[in-house]
Amino acid sequence: MALVPSPRAGGFLPAETHSGPQPPRRRVRQSTAGAAPTATRAPRRRAATASPGEPPSTTASGRPPAANNVSLTPNSRLRGTIVAPRGQGLLYAIDTATNSPMEIKFHRRLASALTRLLQVNLRSVPADLNEAFLDSLDSSQIRTLALKLKVPRVEVWTCGSRGVVVPSIIHPQQERAGAEEGDEGERQDTEDFLNFPLRFLVRGRQVHLIQEMQSVQRCEYCARFYKYQHECTVRRRDFYFHHINAHSSGWWQKINFFPIGSHPRVERLFVTYDVETYTWMGAFGKQLVPFMLVMHLSGEEALVKEACRLACELQWDTWGNDERTFYVVTPEKLAVGKKFREYRNRLQAHFALQLWRGFLAANPQLAEWACLEMGLFSPDYLTYEELQKAPKLQGRPRFLELYIVGHNINGFDEIVLAAQVINNRSDVPGPFKITRNFMPRAGKILFNDITFALPNPSSKKRTDYRLWEQGACDDSDFKYQFLKVMVRDTFALTHTSLRKAAQAYTLPVEKGCCPYKAVNEFYMLGSYRADERGFPAEDYWKDREEYLLNRELWEKKQCPHYDLVRETLDYCALDVLVTAALVQKLRESYAQFIRDAVGLPEASFNVFQRPTISSNSHAIFRQILYRTVKPQRSDLGGSLLAPSHEMYDYVRASIRGGRCYPTYIGVLREPLYVYDICGMYASALTHPMPWGFPLNPYERALAVRDWEHALLQVGTPIDYFNRTLLPGIFTIDADPPPENLLDVLPPLCSRKGGRLCWTNEPLRGEVVTSVDLITLHNRGWHVRLLPDERATVFPEWRCVAKEYVHLNITAKERADREKNQTLRSIAKLLSNALYGSFATKLDNKKIVFSDQMDSATIKSIAAGQINIKSTSFVETDTLSAEVMPTFQRAYSPEQLAVVHSDAEESDEEPGHAPFYTPTHKPNDHVTYTYKPITFMDAEEDDLCLHTLEKVDPLVENNRYPSQIASFVLAWTRAFVSEWSEILYAEDRGTPLEQRTLKSVYGDTDSLFVTEAGYRLMETRGKKRIKKHGGNLVFDPKHPELAWLVECETVCAQCGADAYSPESVFLAPKLYALKCLRCPSCQQISKGKLRAKGHAAETLNYDLMLKCYLADFQGEDARFHTSRMSLKRTLASAQPGARPFTVTETNLTRTLRPWKDITLAPLDAHRLVPYSQSRPNPRNQEVCWIEMP
């Protein structure tokens, strides 16, 4: 390092450090602005030191010492070569006028450079332009300087952002001439002007004189400026592309990471509840109103005791002898929600106050500081921002979590109660930072979490990440100590009914059920139909079997009379206890799974920390990846990135949905077998995925060239695991082979016609993965890569999810051996949920309450960056309220007189007050009738919901690597493509009309094959049938596609493959197999029926057959199915929908064959994909095609 004397007053500055290779050490030349071409050498000797009391030394001429004669004090420890500052500087920038790169050579000191320039041109410096003025000149004084120097023209080059210069021109002569013309009789100055222009460079507020400007070249890949040639490295090209380039620097973002485990000292309280409702006929239809709520308290013993005490204080009734189970029963419309809201608010306020008192006990100095510095008599009145300014805080942080839990409450109970309980305005001390995460999505409340936070004195930035690799964290990792109030739904973690979940996790379940139809009728009409002992009539139950079972169970209780409300309460309480047991079982089971199966014994895993099984699976995946990669930072590093902005939409365009369509409509009277791919998404996840920072444009072009060479080899298959071909996402055109080489399982689908179609038509401008390139090429398609700046190539393949899938499969196999149903359920759910987390679709919308809008959001709305798309209000009769009824009061004239009061001025028009109207009576009293007044138990901001949307359509994504989802689906298409080779390779060259029928229906992971297809599967496809052995997990040592199928239609008695002798297909997801017949034991079992959107329990094979025949024969018959549906409204701007309500609607759907088909008919029954001879009639897109 060299020490450079600063050109300004003040000593030494370290020389600029250059990251590139340094030249060999040599004696440094010294130059100044006015130096001769051959500069003198700087002396390599230490400057003489002066004693502390001596004045600064001078030269023999009496002038101060030169810049290189530097005086050092005895305490100076500076080492190195002393060099003078350079007189000139170089700047490379882009001219905004011509968009061309240029080199600007300028003088660093304006005074010396301008003086020397004027001396060379035999001009003297004006007296008022002294050295101090010139060196301190800023951009606003350039015009003044030009007028004083009387130059014909001044060019000003101003440095802008991101390496650009903006030129501007000043004409001082014209301005001077205009000023002199305005003064009559004044003679124009005849003094000579400078006969050449001046050019100035403005950097910040400094002005420099430009010595020379010339055009240069700029590398488009690394942005380096050069005159003739240059060398740029891969590292520099990558850095420029991902971090500097304004267009592409935001395309890929690093994924944030935090350990999967929670803090080991978190104290948790679980409030598990369930509600029962009845139907109330209102203005918006049949609205469901709660009349009963049962809750059970569990968790940390100390917290449970305090919660129970508070419930007793609020006069909740205990259920039976269980001191931790409480209930409320009342038919009053708003009473249940109001009481539950009061309890939740009091609970969170109590624990928040407890947390604050502990914080004050650890920081007793706060009271004195708040009084002296803030003028407050109590620290309770501090704000969070003021609390952060307090002197050094201390104390051990405390973490509290309050969970409101139920089964399927996010889609029903929380919506019904939301208008009464959705409130975060609690009586908590002022220093808390209160944040709220409320997210309604798809008819459910996905998040409704409130956090009360205080500063954490132990918080600091982590430098050693080994603890994170083990999934654990400590006090220093949390910025806040907090109380979190979270709503969690066990249905989101089990994806099944409460009874099935209890069976899956080996929990005891009481027999019997409740006649909710009778309960509903009782609360609607005041009575219900029953026998002499009050037992509900048989038609209130599902069937006679259920009626007899429940009657038998009730008679065992030996009760003289059936108490409907009491029985409903008991059933509701039992459901709550089962849910509470399920909560405990889920906590223990998942924690053990993380410790044993995942191998993270240090992690304090809490499955309820995240709301869904998908979010938990994604967290486990990231933790496993973090442990493997060891990035030593708070993100996953540069190996796995998330597409963002323009790249997010581009990658999402390559995510193509699953296959689901019949190729046969009507009745099929021949054997039919159903094959399913075993764990299709899990198997696909084990295959190689793109890894690392995407290549820069130069390296990308080289990789694209390799792909183009491979795709030009027509007839030569490409290996899916060819190491010379890098993974990527491309824009392509593709042309199919001749139609006699096509089949009914196309390799790719398209949305160009507005509907998702699996088509054999030419593809234009499709975004696909590199796996799809190989699939198309190997199926005989001619593929061309199109130039696209968003095309992405990754540097390598990596099996990123193989370990995650493998440990789940291992856990599932161990569960089967040990008959551990709980472990099997967990492994199966986690294995199936990961793909969905990768495919999560983000948008720029969010729904907030008015009181949620922080200052940043309000500023964005004011600046036009965020739009309020819609606003809805929670109706007043759905909120907690107190109503003052109509009343009258009579006043005598004396009472109405205003005594000893001053008159008040008012600009308002005289009129009646809004809450009463005067009555006209002949007596001498005045009677006022007050109308009912509703006092809302809510603030005005609590009533208003805003749907906010960013104006910028580009999505910010730093969470989900969506390219993984794209490649997972591409691998599944490769599976199906290989499956089609098994079935249809022998048909290539035969027209479609003359081919044997081998498959009639294709779903995402299944295929319905005929007898001919079954024989091919047992011969050519034998290696892909699970019962014959094979791999479900990709093996990098022996790279090949890993997927297996198994026959779903099996005999229930002997387990052999069975078939359906007769089937009917009406539409996608609308078909029926009459029965299953086993060729081995001749056993006939129940068939299979699928009717998405219909009430399947009301359908059967004969009815669907009748429906098809009626339509085929042209009969004027209508077939309908009807089912009760719950309409959930969260935040809606529709005039007929009320926010936070659940209403019953009767959904009626027409049952009929497929009308709006996305295939081309081949004959009366068979369908084939669209092709060039049978084009898609929906395609209206116009594209440019250059003919050869």
From Swiss-Prot:
<dbReference type="InterPro" id="IPR014382">
    <property type="entry name" value="DNA-dir_DNA_pol_B_adenovir"/>
</dbReference>
<keyword id="KW-0548">Nucleotidyltransferase</keyword>
<dbReference type="Pfam" id="PF03175">
    <property type="entry name" value="DNA_pol_B_2"/>
</dbReference>
<keyword id="KW-0235">DNA replication</keyword>
<keyword id="KW-0239">DNA-directed DNA polymerase</keyword>
<dbReference type="GO" id="GO:0003677">
    <property type="term" value="F:DNA binding"/>
</dbReference>
<dbReference type="InterPro" id="IPR023211">
    <property type="entry name" value="DNA_pol_palm_dom_sf"/>
</dbReference>
<comment type="subunit">
    <text>Heterodimer with the terminal protein; this heterodimer binds to bp 9 to 18 of the genome. Forms a complex with viral pTP, DBP and hosts NFIA and POU2F1/OCT1 for initiation of replication.</text>
</comment>
<protein>
    <recommendedName>
        <fullName>DNA polymerase</fullName>
        <ecNumber>2.7.7.7</ecNumber>
    </recommendedName>
</protein>
<comment type="function">
    <text>Eukaryotic-type DNA polymerase involved in viral genomic replication. DNA synthesis is protein primed, and acts in a strand displacement replication. Assembles in complex with viral pTP, DBP, host NFIA and host POU2F1/OCT1 on viral origin of replication. The polymerase covalently transfers dCMP onto pTP, thereby initiating complementary strand synthesis.</text>
</comment>
<keyword id="KW-1194">Viral DNA replication</keyword>
<dbReference type="InterPro" id="IPR043502">
    <property type="entry name" value="DNA/RNA_pol_sf"/>
</dbReference>
<dbReference type="InterPro" id="IPR017964">
    <property type="entry name" value="DNA-dir_DNA_pol_B_CS"/>
</dbReference>
<dbReference type="InterPro" id="IPR006172">
    <property type="entry name" value="DNA-dir_DNA_pol_B"/>
</dbReference>
<dbReference type="InterPro" id="IPR012337">
    <property type="entry name" value="RNaseH-like_sf"/>
</dbReference>
<feature type="region of interest" description="Disordered">
    <location>
        <begin position="1"/>
        <end position="74"/>
    </location>
</feature>
<keyword id="KW-0808">Transferase</keyword>
<dbReference type="InterPro" id="IPR004868">
    <property type="entry name" value="DNA-dir_DNA_pol_B_mt/vir"/>
</dbReference>
<dbReference type="GO" id="GO:0003887">
    <property type="term" value="F:DNA-directed DNA polymerase activity"/>
</dbReference>
<feature type="compositionally biased region" description="Low complexity">
    <location>
        <begin position="31"/>
        <end position="41"/>
    </location>
</feature>
<comment type="similarity">
    <text>Belongs to the DNA polymerase type-B family.</text>
</comment>
<dbReference type="GO" id="GO:0039693">
    <property type="term" value="P:viral DNA genome replication"/>
</dbReference>
<dbReference type="GO" id="GO:0042025">
    <property type="term" value="C:host cell nucleus"/>
</dbReference>
<keyword id="KW-0238">DNA-binding</keyword>
<keyword id="KW-1048">Host nucleus</keyword>
<dbReference type="GO" id="GO:0006261">
    <property type="term" value="P:DNA-templated DNA replication"/>
</dbReference>
<dbReference type="GO" id="GO:0008408">
    <property type="term" value="F:3'-5' exonuclease activity"/>
</dbReference>
<dbReference type="GO" id="GO:0000166">
    <property type="term" value="F:nucleotide binding"/>
</dbReference>
